[in-house]
Amino acid sequence: TLKEYNWQMKTCAQITTAETYHVPVMLHEAVDGMDIQPGGIYADLTLGGGGHTREILSRMNQNAHLYGFDQDEDAEQNIPSDERFTFVRSNFRYLSNFMRYYGADGKVDAILADLGVSSHHFDDSERGFSFRFDGKLDMRMNKRAGRTAAELVNTLSEEKLADIFYLYGELKNS
């Protein structure tokens, strides 16, 4: 069921627009590749600062719909106020589950995913993604999910940490 994914869905009417925290690189080129059509169904899998979402919405007609996913609660401040948009606070790995839920399973016309860590995450000392600031060693995209990086570093064995660095950090000499 959808409850097991710890998600929240809100429409734009329930959330106000806030200033963005990230400017997308190659914004127009990325959205051009989506070939926005009248009545289409689209997904922005990484809402973040909302830059791609706003550009997609600007190209859509009134019959189209856009679903925006983000597991980071900070992204909620960037949700555009538009009835053609539905925000889903969840990891995009559950895309197919949500599209089935909304009746759009197999009907998404284009998907955009701006993968990676945004400048917002590096600029927030509480997130623990940057060497520039003193702060907690958190490093989670979803602040409610799993253990922090500090908990992992302080509880896992040296062997297990070496495996993690090898598999996910591409440190072949770990």
Which residues make up each language-model segment?
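S-adenosyl-L-methionine-dependent methyltransferase catalytic core, i.e., the SAM/SAH-binding region
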Residues: 1-174
